[in-house]
Each structure stands twice: as structure tokens, then as C-alpha cells.
Amino acid sequence: MIIRKAKMTDSSVISLLMNEAFGWEKTKPSSSLFFLNKNTTCLVAENDHGELMGSASLHLLQKINRRIGIIEDVAVFEKFRGNKIGVNLINELIKLSKNEDCYKVILNTKLDNLSYYEKLGFVSKELQMELRL
């Protein structure tokens, strides 16, 4: 397995992955701004045949006196699940967060997935509120 930074040419496969994993709109293309944002890193996991198996992204947020990493959109194609692809992607994003001097890494998840992230060292803290626009 190879973990690398996503390229703009990966966007159509990443869109398919997001559709499968999260049920996103199939007609909505990936934004090129996502790949050009200097505070965002998207990693992909690729097998030995060059197939994209999963992806995850890190968004750096500069606060007043410190920086945090936000992990988003961790997804693995169903046919590749159970091979620690998500774990490897998350661990790489955690390393990247440390290299970027983040004091913490946060993520949002469904309640069904809590134990998955707890095994990686994450703990439930606070409660996120959201207003969909």
C-alpha cells in the first residue's frame, strides 16, 4: 500500500468514493479549490495496481495562539475495508499534524464509529453543534 498526497487527477475517483461512503450527490464535482488550498492536505491510499482504495483529509486551522488539525472525510471503498487502510491514512494525518505544530487533532464521526477512533487514541470531548446552510 502506498499513501500519497492526492492529485487533481484523483478527483473523479475521490468523488466516487465520497458518494459510496457518505451518499453525497453524484452530480457534484470535486472543487479544484480543495486541491489548491495550502491549509488542506488530502491523502489517498493506493494498492500495488494503482487503484485508489481510500482517502482522508486534514484541514489546518490557525487559532489565536495555536493551531489545530481537523481530520475529515475518512473513507475507504467497501471492497477494500478491513485492511487497515483508514488506520494508516489517519496515522499519516496525525504525523502531518505534529509536523505542522498542531496542539491537537479533532474529527467528527457517527456514534457507530466511536470505538474505531477510540482504538486510535481519540477521546470523546464536548459536543459539536451544526447549522446546515
Q: Where do the protein language model's features map onto the residues?
A:
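Conserved acetyl-CoA-binding loop-helix of GNAT-fold acetyltransferases
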Residues: V76, G82-K95
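Active-site rim helix/loop that mediates acceptor-substrate recognition in acyltransferases
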Residues: G23-L43, S57
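Conserved GNAT acetyl-CoA-binding A-motif
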Residues: S97-T109
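A conserved beta-turn-beta hairpin within the catalytic core of GNAT-like acetyltransferases
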Residues: L61-I71, R81, K125
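Conserved beta-strand in the GNAT
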Residues: V44, E51-L60, I70, A75
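Conserved active-site alpha-helix within GNAT-family acetyltransferase domains
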Residues: V87, Y103, L111-L133
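Short amphipathic alpha-helix that is part of the acyltransferase structural core
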Residues: M1-K28, H49
